[in-house]
A protein has these predicted regions:
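Non-catalytic interaction-recognition regions
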Residues: 1-246
Length: 246
């Protein structure tokens, strides 16, 4: 930190001497972070980022195939090029989210199997929640419950899980502001994990699409839409791609 303080001070003096129109060095701040263990070779050599990203893509692709083989729903219908793009996005999400899933001064132990899981506090878990919401909207269009012309009336909501989700959505701006003030992207990551968990609890407990109850179904679709918008926004802030299918 002393090194960067000296660098910023020197740049500040240069800005004054050269009469820069904006003294941007005065606004510079060094953001410290912890150490990541498990990201070196067996010989103790550093690992290049490109190699890590390639490994993440390949592992994510294999993990997707293995998971699809054991899933009752089977694999998503993706073309070869789309499957490769999804694997790359999932691999990147796994790495990016791992880095922000703890407070930045925390020392981390890297584990490939842990960061690629589709359950728990991981990037792929958040992407899967987003993809699940997109699947709900595709199914809604198929059964004639598209929200385009008739948005839902939230007054039709009443279940505890529904209002827990509404309450969680209200906390997004607080999490973003806290992340900016504290220089802690963890605040956004932690919020998104809680949001996805609350959404999954709602989804597992209630039927979103019921043609026999169109009013309630459209209300729940509106709730899912709001949740997806917040989740997508948060993922974008973390640099993670929100996926429509996985």
């Amino acid at each position: 930190e002393d090194h960067f303080a000296q660098v910023f001070a020197a740049l500040g003096k240069l800005a004054v001497a050269e009469q820069w129109p904006v003294n941007w060095p005065a606004r510079c701040e060094n953001i410290s972070f912890g150490y990541v263990r498990g990201m070196s070779t067996r010989k103790g050599e550093a690992v290049w980022l490109e190699a890590v990203l390639d490994e993440a893509r390949d592992r994510a692709g294999r993990f997707r195939v293995q998971r699809a083989e054991t899933s009752a729903r089977g694999p998503a219908s993706l073309a070869a090029g789309e499957a490769d793009a999804v694997s790359e996005a999932v691999g990147q999400a796994a790495l990016l989210y791992f880095d922000v899933s703890s407070r930045r001064m925390t020392d981390l132990s890297f584990d490939w199997d842990a960061v690629l899981q589709f359950e728990g506090n991981t990037g792929p878990y958040l992407q899967y929640a987003h993809a699940r919401m997109s699947g709900i909207f595709r199914k809604a269009a198929e059964v004639g419950l598209d929200m385009a012309d008739e948005p839902g009336d939230l007054a039709a909501l009443g279940a505890d899980e529904e209002w827990l989700l509404v309450q969680k959505l209200r906390g997004y701006s607080v999490a973003v502001r806290r992340a900016a003030e504290q220089r802690e992207p963890f605040e956004i990551a932690h919020y998104l994990y809680e949001l996805a968990s609350v959404f999954n609890a709602f989804y597992n407990r209630h039927v979103v699409l019921d043609v026999a109850e169109p009013v309630r179904s459209r209300a729940r679709l509106s709730l899912v839409k709001a949740t997806q918008q917040v989740l997508r926004s948060g993922l974008q802030l973390l640099g993670i791609r929100a996926l429509e299918q996985m």
